[in-house]
Amino acid sequence: MLASGENVNILVLDTEVYSNTGGQSSKSTPAGAIAKFAASGKKIRKKDLGMMAMSYGYVYVAQVAMGANPVQYLNAIKEAEAYDGPSLIIAYAPCINHGLKAGMGLSQKEEKLAVECGYWHLYRFNPELEGTDKNPFSLDSKEPDWSKFQDFLKGEVRFASLYKLFPERADELLQRTEEFAKIRLESYKKLAGK
């Protein structure tokens, strides 16, 4: 759909698993997460759908988390609607398969924690800004507090279960998850000129 160049707006609720069919591992599942077909924790990083869409060069792309920054979320929706071409908004969406220890009633708080610790990054890419004095890529997240990253992961059963099921590999896999988040952030900083 994005490759068509049509003026269409797409909202992806990124649960990081195939939620509608029972929580199977997907290309969007992060390293270290336990899901069906990744019972010992996924070993490779998740695909970066936003970067893939930006590679077209003519797709508006935003990554959002409403619980973390409602203003950025609304700005992304307004910009996507105003953009004359395909737009993609990727929204972090905690789901039952994450096993939030705090409970699903606090999913907005979970989104905020995800951004604060660096697990999820907020940005907007507007191709209309190319050729102007403004950078088309805006990194909207603040610098993460990496000291909270591992606690964030341990607050979700999909990651914390590694310590019960595979204690000898848990630290390594969850550290890998943090390393992949840092790599993603560095690539976003380069795009933002930081």
Regions found by a protein language model. Give the residues of each.
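Metallocofactor- and cofactor-centric catalytic cores in central/energy metabolism, strongly enriched
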Residues: 20, 76-80, 104, 136, ...
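Glycine-rich ThDP/TPP pyrophosphate-binding loop and its adjacent helix/strand module
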Residues: 2-8, 13-143, 149
